[in-house]
Curated annotation (Swiss-Prot):
Annotated function: Intermediary in the transfer of excitation energy from the chlorophyll to the reaction centers.
Biological process according to GO: photosynthesis
Sites where the protein binds bacteriochlorophyll a 7: H297
Listed name of the protein: Bacteriochlorophyll a protein
Binding site for bacteriochlorophyll a 3: H298
Disulfide bonds: none
Organism this protein belongs to: Chlorobaculum tepidum (strain ATCC 49652 / DSM 12025 / NBRC 103806 / TLS)
UniProt keyword Cytoplasm present: no
Gene3D superfamilies according to UniProt: Bacteriochlorophyll A
Gene name per UniProt: fmoA
Subunit structure, interactors included: Homotrimer. Each subunit contains 7 molecules of bacteriochlorophyll a.
Length: 366
């Protein structure tokens, strides 16, 4: 392993497959597999997580979509599950609103909740670099300001006691917001973002009260914070570009799995996306840069000595189509199937995994 001063070798394996639709369709299927032998970077406990995400268009012209997500994990033999369904719409060019509900369960405990909130963006990105599909560090959407209202039914004594204790804690100390920032998940995230130059503000609890509901008391909280969405690098923006709401004329879906143990980390992703290719003019279409090895690109930006990459990419074009330009150049071709591995492609992947940038572009046509 090559993180945090270790002298061991890190080996990252990745295998990507992109299958494109014909005509002017921007849709495509993406299959990704990544495996890294990174014991020191793994959690102390084995983790097993599955994610299912469905995005359904309600009014694509207005960016109105419904997202359904299920997250299931097993950590230290305890099964956890989070189910969420939310409707998201663009209220203005800078403001998105969302309303949803969900359920969380940990072991034998389960509970429902509802939420509504908004995100305000200072600016959106639409740079020429993104359109050209050149993997430079592209900023996403600028700084984002969140205003979230949470409602949790207090339908048992344990929850009521916990809620009353939380209300009392906020009323008796001014450091409660610091506690949220430092000890909740936002703590590690806050540190990581700051070290990467992506400034975020602490989470502030602006409201915490109890209301009466049809079945009893309801705990209501309002959370406000901002984060540096502008600090996201190109690999993340590629994932976002795979979901353009104006192209979402049918449901999109993703199934993913994450496994970690003492031997390393493994990720599997299978998805059908509406934004795998874009019109490049002159009868050409451009394949969006396949999301760079997620674990390697984001999990390996540390101090490492030895680092090996074993990466492959397969692109399957619609029947009758050909690649007109590719950088890095593909290694082999069989009819509409093209493959990349080794050589310039491997050097490009390793360069990106170490924090560098470089050209990746595929143009195809009939």
């Amino acid at each position: 392993m090559a993180l945090f001063g270790s002298n061991d070798v890190t080996t990252a394996h990745s295998d990507y497959e992109i299958v494109l639709e014909g005509g002017s369709s921007s849709w495509g299927k993406v299959k990704a597999r990544a495996k890294v032998n990174a014991p020191p970077a793994s959690p102390l406990l084995p983790a097993d997580c599955d994610v299912k995400l469905n995005v359904k268009p309600l009014d694509p012209a207005k960016g109105f979509v419904r997202i359904s997500a299920v997250f299931e994990s097993i950590v230290d033999s305890t099964k956890n599950k989070l189910t969420i369904e939310a409707d998201i719409a663009n209220e203005t060019k800078e403001r998105r609103i969302s309303v949803g509900e969900g359920m969380v369960s940990v072991g034998d405990f389960s509970h429902t909740f509802s939420f509504e909130g908004s995100v305000v963006n200072l600016f959106y990105y639409r740079s020429d670099a993104v359109r050209r599909n050149v993997p430079n560090p592209i900023y996403m959407q600028g700084r984002q300001f969140h205003d979230i209202l949470m409602k949790v039914p207090l339908d048992n004594n344990d929850l009521i006691d916990t809620w009353e204790g939380t209300v009392k804690a906020i009323g008796s100390t001014g450091a409660f917001n610091d506690w949220i920032r430092d000890f909740w998940f936002i703590g590690p995230a806050f540190t990581a973002l700051n070290e990467g130059g992506q400034r975020i503000s602490r989470i502030e609890v602006n409201g915490l009260n109890t209301e009466s509901g049809p079945k009893g008391p309801v705990g209501v909280s309002r959370w406000r914070f901002s984060h540096g969405g502008s600090g996201m690098v190109d690999s993340i923006s590629r994932w976002a570009e795979l979901f353009p709401s104006d192209k979402l004329n049918r449901p999109a879906q993703v199934e993913a799995g994450f496994r970690s143990d003492s031997q390393g980390i493994e990720v599997k992703v299978d998805g059908e996306f509406p934004g795998v290719s874009v019109d490049a003019g002159g009868g050409l279409r451009r394949i969006l840069n396949h999301p760079l090895i997620p674990l390697v690109h984001h999990g390996m930006v540390g101090k490492f000595n030895n680092f090996n990459v074993d990466a492959q990419l397969k692109v399957v074009l619609p029947k009758g189509y050909k690649i007109r330009y590719a950088a890095p150049q593909y290694r082999s071709q069989n009819l509409e199937e093209y493959r990349w591995s080794g050589g310039a492609y491997a050097r490009w992947v390793e360069h990106v995994c170490k924090g560098g940038v470089g050209q990746f572009e595929i143009l195809y046509a009939q």
